[in-house]
């Protein structure tokens, strides 16, 4: 950060216009720099409303964006017993499975706010597993790979990310949900910074995962699969963070397997740039991408990552957004 400030004078922070997102961006900036952040940060707010493009809320640019998971039938199935159990304590009003589902959500917010909630004990472990699975299905089929426009809604941000990685101006000929008014100007969409911070929604992070085409996150969740990778509580919990780090390595970094078996001498590897992806502080191996090696450290060469996504605008994803 200090190096970035010394070389570029300003950090670059973007946020959508919903107040909670703006507040998060302001809090992060203050925590990063202290109260002097206003003197060290370019702070950009992009409008989240119909008629405005922004990769931080791409649903406004995608007319075909719609929920595809039929939630009510599943909720009635897993909360049927809970509804009957709670109804006996409520007189003069009917308790429905959707109301009970809302009660489970109250527990979630209460727990995040205060650390623990006695309210949660109203439900059994099986009912909480059903609640977790509800959100896994919702995010996978509403915003992720399970929705026909899931990758499309993450494509615009991926296009911007490639521009940042390669330090090249945004390409208007492949525009999807990007805001051309911002991205056409270097001061509003800089590509020369060492650190960028974008603040958006958990749904958008899910769409970006879909656009990245990481195999482990492309498998539809199943209730009886205890090892499923797409688990919303781990992928996009409250305060979810997706971080990409670029390493400039002046000395070679061979795959760990090559070092272990001493098959290839170090001098065979030229200096290289590597990319690492972290999701909520956990390293996400990039070996599932077509041009990335299978490495125990999860790294991929920057060129390999870029080559893996060179065809991203040729998949017809954005055409689905147009119906």
Predicted features and spans:
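Signature for phosphate-centric chemistry
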Residues: 1-12, 16-196, 200-323
């Amino acid at each position: 950060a200090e190096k970035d400030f010394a070389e570029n004078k300003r950090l670059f922070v973007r946020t959508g216009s919903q107040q909670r997102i703006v507040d998060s961006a302001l809090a992060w900036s203050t925590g990063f720099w202290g109260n002097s952040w206003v003197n060290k940060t370019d702070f950009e707010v992009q409008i989240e409303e119909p008629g405005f493009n922004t990769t931080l809320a791409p649903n406004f640019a995608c007319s075909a964006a719609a929920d595809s998971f039929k939630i009510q039938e599943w909720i009635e199935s897993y909360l049927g017993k809970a509804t009957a159990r709670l109804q006996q304590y409520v007189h003069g009003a009917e308790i429905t499975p959707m109301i009970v589902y809302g009660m489970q959500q109250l527990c979630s917010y209460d727990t995040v706010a205060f650390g623990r909630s006695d309210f949660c004990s109203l439900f059994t472990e099986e009912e909480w597993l059903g609640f977790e699975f509800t959100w896994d299905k919702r995010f996978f089929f509403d915003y992720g790979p399970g929705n026909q426009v899931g990758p499309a809604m993450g494509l615009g941000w991926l296009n911007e990310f490639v521009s940042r990685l390669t330090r090249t101006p945004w390409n208007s000929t492949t525009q999807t949900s990007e805001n051309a008014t911002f991205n056409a100007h270097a001061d509003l969409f800089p590509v020369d910074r060492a650190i960028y911070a974008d603040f958006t929604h958990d749904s958008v992070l899910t769409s970006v995962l879909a656009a990245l085409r990481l195999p482990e996150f492309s498998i539809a969740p199943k209730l009886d699969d205890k090892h499923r990778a797409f688990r919303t509580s781990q992928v996009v919990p409250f305060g979810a963070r997706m971080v990409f780090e670029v390493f400039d390595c002046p000395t070679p970094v061979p795959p760990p397997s090559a070092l272990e078996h001493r098959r290839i001498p170090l001098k065979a590897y030229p200096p290289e740039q590597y990319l690492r992806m972290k999701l909520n502080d956990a390293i996400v191996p990039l070996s599932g991408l077509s041009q990335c090696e299978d490495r125990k450290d999860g790294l991929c060469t920057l060129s390999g990552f870029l080559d893996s996504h060179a065809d991203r605008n040729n998949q017809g994803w954005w055409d689905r957004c147009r119906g």
